């Protein structure tokens, strides 16, 4: 704490004289076409300064508060050739720079909004569906390099809950959009589909269990030019998964001055020592290659763990003596044994990431009518996660190995690779794009600080007797116990080949018809690799008490066995048609249709109609209706694993089996089919003045036959049925099901205002509010084999899953951000509101509600000649979520904070960042 305070005091003293002297200059001018007519809504950006402006109806623009220095000024507008100019700005000076843009029919240059319309408008407010655009400057001011966390701070419709004691999800966290599952959001990179992560979230907070999302944190944050979030169903345009919407990550391109960013921070919070120290280093360079460019980026992240666990009042030594602990504060009143407290871990794990990315673009002629392009990246992550503590007298422990008990750890190795490339050309008025993309994500389960209790207390020699209980016979496993294991691997692969064509047609309507057609071929693969033998085998040894067989498999995560191992793939062919045009001078219409055929479950057709009506120049009404679908994930169809759950305070072996497994069929499992959806939205965009925009959008999403991980069939009746059916070693069964329908209703409100502040300052105010309510409208009944029995279950979904779908995400989310710029000085303040939510834990299902919380973030900084220095705080006032009261929701008072908290439970984070231009 003191070190952090000294650091920030020093930085403030360094900044103070600079803040007092902050002035900056102004760039202003006019944008016109070749004939001198003014061009409205052209984007003018001062590259390197992070400042931009939009031209008004007279073509005029002004960028104020520009730090002294030289900049490349870029002006661009859809339908015109982009233009750049080099300007030098002095302190307090005003520079005039006009642009005359030449018209072109179809441009291959990137534009401001890609998703939402194949016609590619330049302003989100012009679209018939809501799209948020977050620039690199906005992304870089959040005090974190985690893209998922950045999006959650900027877009209230996105949720990115922190995870702890959730197996692999501790290390690869998914995000959700509009309260749906991670796999209901399609992620694109430069307009190409991004592959999903290999991990299946069988344990997760803030979302329904059993989905696989996209690991946004595998992309270097410094390589991102902007992120576009389409908040509307788009399966008819982009294919499976786009039920909640689309996130398009657009990477930086072109020649630019090399940069290097270094950010360091630490959590300094009440009642806990400083922890979670983080260092992030990222940089990039872009240089010309012939007519084109090549950009290279790299990033390294090191984050120490955080721990918010309280001491354990049940932790006893061999004499049976426990510490005396205050249950209201978690403080140790009297230390009465020599055991280390806390013995649990409740917080972020250690994380180390290395990431690279490259983006290449080469026009093949001077007119820029044809080009080749390529982009891709590689990332590698190692980290830690934890399970539940195993006490010294647990049947999962051997005192000879862990005299004081042990806390098992996940040490995964995660690799992610992607590559894409293609050819674009303008041919006879057609804009053609032929390309391919390949991506893979691999997750290795390495388990440490654990053991396989069934192999006995021996590390040097084999002492497990096998199934017959007699050491020395032929069924002995013949291997000693271990303290670490390779428990297996999951890998996901995806190959996509696509051809897209677009043309502007004159059909006698008030404006040309934008026609887009295309076809795609996709091949997906999902593989489970078995762990080493010692990680899954049952050695047959009795437990330390000599009464019952010891639990088999590496404790906390039993390895994938050979029977779990599999390698499955499928293919998909899709074709689409997209038409957009103005039917009148005020009414724009967009119609899209898509047909897809899957090799494993069949065919699906979807459609979309979107309308935009503009009764006045500054007011737009918009609405859309679409059908969508999501194909069953390969991991949902073929995942198989026996793992350890804490159910009713006991360790139970739970079998997660494919739906075609006989143990699943006993309880009514059926072959998975596609989810189908209907999405309706309506709203308006209002720009009463050039510096203010307000949007309001209502939405309703109905999903039928939704796929989720069903209830755990593990009560006494289910166990008897399993035993009678020949599955005596299985304590419980879970499988995936299409067994429910859901309805999601909500509204998004956004507002942006820019005003002058003083002689040379600028104040940008932005607000965003999201309300989302999920409701389960249908649940399948109990399987016939359980109907009429004394089972504890009431449906194929348990209460924990129902709460996870309907209540574990705040209904209300809102942000209010103020950004002030004056010369070299810049500052940012944000107020974020997270509404109340509810959560429950397995078996006991003690549903608890937690109140809403308000967090404050702040950042100030100063632009030096070649560097930008910033300091800031996330959660400035050290706000924590409410504490669970029920014994089984707080793990007997060792997990003191709500597990499903949407903003985590790490407390205040202080950071400093320096951004350097290397010229």
Question: What are the residue ranges of the model-derived segments?
Answer:
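Extracytoplasmic beta-strand/coil segments of soluble accessory domains associated
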Residues: 148-198, 241
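Outer-membrane beta-barrel transmembrane domain signature of Gram-negative proteins
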Residues: 400-402, 406-419, 425-426, 436-438, ...
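C-terminal beta-signal and adjacent terminal beta-strands/loops
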Residues: 773, 831-840, 862-919
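Short, acidic, small-residue-rich periplasmic hinge/interaction motif at the N-terminus
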Residues: 32-37, 42-47, 76-78, 90, ...
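Outer-membrane beta-barrel translocator/receptor signature
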Residues: 206-214, 222-225, 236-248, 252-319, ...
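Short, acidic Ser/Thr/Gly-rich low-complexity loop/linker segments typical of extracellular
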Residues: 49-62
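Short acidic/polar hinge/loop motifs at secondary-structure boundaries
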Residues: 192-231
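N-terminal periplasmic accessory domains that precede
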Residues: 96-99, 147-154, 175-176, 188, ...
């Amino acid at each position: 704490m003191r070190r952090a305070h000294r650091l920030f005091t020093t930085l403030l003293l360094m900044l103070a004289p600079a803040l007092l002297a902050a002035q900056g200059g102004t760039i202003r001018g006019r944008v016109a076409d070749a004939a001198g007519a003014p061009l409205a809504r052209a984007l003018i950006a001062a590259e390197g300064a992070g400042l931009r402006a939009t031209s008004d109806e007279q073509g005029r623009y002004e960028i104020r508060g520009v730090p002294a220095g030289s900049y490349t000024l870029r002006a661009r507008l859809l339908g015109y050739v982009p233009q750049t100019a080099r300007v030098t700005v002095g302190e307090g000076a005003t520079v005039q720079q006009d642009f005359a843009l030449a018209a072109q029919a179809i441009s291959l240059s990137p534009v401001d909004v890609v998703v939402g319309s194949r016609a590619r408008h330049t302003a989100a407010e012009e679209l018939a569906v809501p799209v948020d655009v977050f620039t690199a400057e906005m992304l870089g001011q959040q005090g974190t390099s985690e893209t998922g966390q950045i999006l959650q701070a900027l877009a209230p419709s996105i949720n990115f809950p922190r995870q702890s004691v959730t197996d692999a999800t501790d290390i690869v966290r998914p995000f959700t959009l509009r309260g749906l599952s991670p796999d209901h959001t399609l992620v694109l990179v430069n307009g190409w589909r991004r592959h999903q992560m290999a991990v299946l979230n069988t344990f997760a907070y803030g979302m329904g269990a059993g989905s696989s999302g996209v690991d946004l944190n595998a992309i270097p944050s410094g390589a991102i030019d902007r992120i576009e979030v389409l908040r509307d169903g788009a399966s008819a345009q982009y294919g499976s998964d786009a039920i909640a919407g689309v996130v398009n990550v657009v990477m930086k391109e072109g020649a630019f001055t090399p940069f290097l960013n270094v950010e360091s921070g630490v959590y300094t919070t009440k009642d806990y020592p400083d922890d979670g120290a983080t260092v992030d280093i990222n940089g990039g360079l872009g240089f010309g290659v012939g007519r084109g460019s090549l950009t290279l980026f790299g990033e390294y992240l090191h984050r120490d763990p955080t721990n918010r666990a309280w001491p354990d009042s049940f932790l006893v030594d061999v004499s049976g003596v426990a510490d005396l602990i205050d249950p209201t504060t978690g403080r140790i009143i009297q230390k009465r044994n020599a055991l280390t407290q806390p013995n649990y871990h409740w917080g972020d794990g250690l994380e180390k990431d290395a990431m690279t990315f490259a983006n290449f673009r080469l026009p093949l002629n001077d007119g820029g009518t044809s080009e080749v392009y390529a982009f891709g990246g590689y990332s590698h992550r190692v980290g830690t996660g934890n399970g539940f503590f195993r006490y010294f007298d647990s049947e999962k422990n051997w005192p000879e190995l862990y005299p004081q008990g042990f806390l098992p750890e996940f040490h995964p190795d995660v690799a992610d690779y992607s590559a894409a490339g293609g050819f674009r050309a303008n041919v006879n008025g057609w804009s053609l794009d032929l390309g391919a993309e390949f991506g893979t994500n691999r997750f290795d389960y390495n388990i440490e600080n654990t053991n396989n209790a069934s192999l006995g207390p021996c590390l040097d020699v084999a002492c497990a007797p096998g199934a017959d209980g007699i050491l020395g016979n032929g069924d002995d496993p013949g291997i000693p116990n271990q303290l670490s294991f390779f428990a297996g691997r999951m890998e996901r692969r995806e190959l996509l080949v696509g051809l897209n064509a677009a043309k502007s047609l004159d059909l006698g309507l008030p404006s040309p018809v934008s026609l887009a057609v295309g076809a795609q071929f996709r091949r997906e693969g999902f593989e489970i690799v078995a762990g080493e033998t010692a990680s899954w085998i049952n050695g047959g040894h009795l437990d330390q008490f000599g009464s019952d067989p010891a639990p088999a498999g590496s404790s906390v995560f039993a390895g994938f066995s050979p029977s779990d191992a599999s390698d499955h793939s499928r293919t998909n062919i899709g074709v689409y048609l997209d038409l957009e045009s103005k039917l009148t001078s005020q009414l724009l219409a967009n119609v899209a249709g898509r047909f897809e055929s899957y090799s494993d479950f069949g065919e699906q057709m979807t459609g979309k109609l979107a309308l935009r009506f503009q009764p006045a120049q500054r007011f737009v009404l918009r609405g859309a209706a679409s059908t969508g679908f999501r194909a069953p994930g390969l991991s949902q169809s073929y995942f198989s694993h026996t793992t350890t759950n804490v159910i009713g305070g006991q360790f139970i072996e739970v079998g997660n089996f494919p739906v075609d497994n006989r143990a699943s069929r006993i309880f009514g499992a059926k072959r998975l089919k596609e989810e189908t959806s209907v999405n309706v939205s309506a709203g308006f965009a209002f720009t009463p003045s050039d510096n203010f925009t307000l949007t309001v959008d209502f939405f309703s999403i109905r999903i039928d036959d939704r796929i989720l991980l069903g209830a755990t069939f593990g009560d006494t009746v289910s166990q008897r049925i399993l035993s009678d059916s020949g599955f005596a070693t299985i304590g419980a069964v879970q499988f995936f099901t299409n067994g429910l329908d859901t309805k999601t209703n909500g509204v998004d409100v956004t507002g942006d205002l820019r005003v002058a502040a003083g002689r040379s300052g600028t104040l940008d105010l932005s607000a965003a509010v999201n309300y989302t309510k999920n409701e389960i409208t249908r649940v399948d009944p109990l399987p016939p084999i359980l109907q009429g029995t004394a089972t504890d279950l009431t449906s194929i979904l348990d209460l924990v899953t129902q709460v996870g779908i309907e209540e574990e995400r705040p209904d209300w989310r809102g942000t209010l951000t103020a950004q002030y710029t004056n010369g070299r000085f810049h500052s940012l303040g944000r107020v974020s509101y997270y509404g109340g939510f509810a959560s429950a834990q397995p078996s006991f299902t003690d549903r608890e509600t937690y109140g809403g919380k308000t967090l404050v973030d702040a950042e100030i900084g100063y632009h030096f000649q070649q560097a930008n220095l910033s300091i800031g705080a996330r959660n400035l006032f050290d706000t924590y979520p409410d504490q669970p009261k029920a014994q089984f929701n707080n793990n007997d008072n060792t997990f003191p904070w709500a597990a499903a908290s949407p903003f985590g439970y790490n407390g205040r984070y202080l950071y400093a960042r320096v951004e350097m231009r290397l010229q």
